[in-house]
Swiss-Prot record:
This is Ribonuclease Z. Zn(2+) 1 binds at residues 63, 65, 141, 208. Belongs to the RNase Z family. Pfam families: Lactamase_B. Zn(2+) 2 binds at residues 67-68, 208, 266.
Length: 306
């Protein structure tokens, strides 16, 4: 799985429509499948997207309103049916442990997969396992809700022409990486002079929330900011009373965060044309898309910092 992309499996809030399923979002990245907020019917959406559910390795639940978690149980059962051998990590607010258990054990089946739970009871870095660093922050919603920032580590890349000019090859390259310098024939060579840093990419996933500082912090310089925009500005009063955002508010948060790309989602069923969200947000933040089911949003590797 060498691709780097977000695939939208659903983008409706609260209830599905004839054209939009409840939300579910899959990031395929660094040989992992990161599934966020699987709503009702997510398992079936994988079929329509022509993606094997077995790519999923980590599941994130922002909060336990039904449209963000009702697909959890069926996804775990499907992975069990498919006999996946890799662990399935599940991240969710610790305060919702009883709801997680109800979803996981809501029906009779023989569980054979290895599910590793990560109930989150604090903000900040909640896991760093080499491929990614996972950060969680509390959002401003009606119930305990987490937003997520996923960041890959920076990597050091050698500059081929400089390495060749110095005649370096083989195990000594690992010595240079480890020690930051090596001495050959009385001459000291420094890693910083023979390499560059490729900054690790970040993505942010913002589910239900009013605009708040946590949203900006999570989305700071993110390659993709996936953000709820339940309402348009004409219904801003509903957004405020239900603790959601409008498309304009989401765009304003993306601009403040310096995000590179904004993907809007979680559209209220009252709106038939999601294009309206994109048009509203573009007035503030040009590089924006209204999520479309089964569409892929790619984020190729960042160019190196030489």
């Amino acid at each position: 799985m060498s691709c780097r992309e977000l695939i939208v499996l659903g983008c409706s809030s609260q209830q599905p429509t004839r054209t939009r399923n409840q939300g579910a979002y899959l990031f395929r990245w660094n040989n992992e499948g990161l599934l966020f907020d699987p709503g009702e019917g997510t398992q079936r959406q994988f079929i329509f997207a022509n993606i094997a559910p077995t790519v999923v390795s980590r599941i994130f639940i922002s909060h336990f309103h039904g449209d963000h978690c009702l697909g959890l149980g069926s996804m775990l059962m499907r992975l069990n049916l498919d006999k996946v051998t890799h662990p399935i990590h599940c991240y969710y607010p610790a305060s919702g442990k009883k709801y997680f258990d109800r979803l996981r054990y809501g029906t009779i089946y023989h569980e054979t997969i290895h599910v590793i739970e990560h109930p989150i009871d604090r903000e900040g870095i909640v896991e760093d396992f080499g491929s990614f660093r996972i950060e969680a922050r509390r959002l401003d919603h009606l119930v305990d809700t987490l937003g997520w920032r996923i960041t890959e580590p920076d990597t050091i890349k050698f500059i081929p022409e400089k390495i060749k000019a110095c005649g370096l090859r083989g195990p000594i390259m690992q010595d240079l990486l480890r020690d930051k310098q090596i001495t050959i024939n009385g001459k000291t060579l420094y890693l910083k002079d023979l390499s560059y840093v490729r900054k690790g990419d970040s993505v942010a996933v913002i589910s239900d929330s009013l605009p708040c500082q946590s949203v900006i912090d999570l989305a700071r310089d993110a390659r993709i900011m996936l953000c709820e925009s339940t309402y348009l500005e004409e219904h801003r009063h509903l957004a405020k009373s239900h603790y959601h955002m409008t498309a304009k508010q989401a765009a304003t948060q993306a601009l403040a965060a310096g995000a590179q790309q904004l993907v809007l989602t979680h559209f209220s069923a009252r709106y038939l044309n999601s294009r309206e969200f994109e048009l509203e947000a573009k007035e503030i933040f040009p590089n924006v898309f209204a999520a479309e089911e089964f569409r892929s949003y790619s984020f190729p590797k960042n160019p190196p910092s030489k």
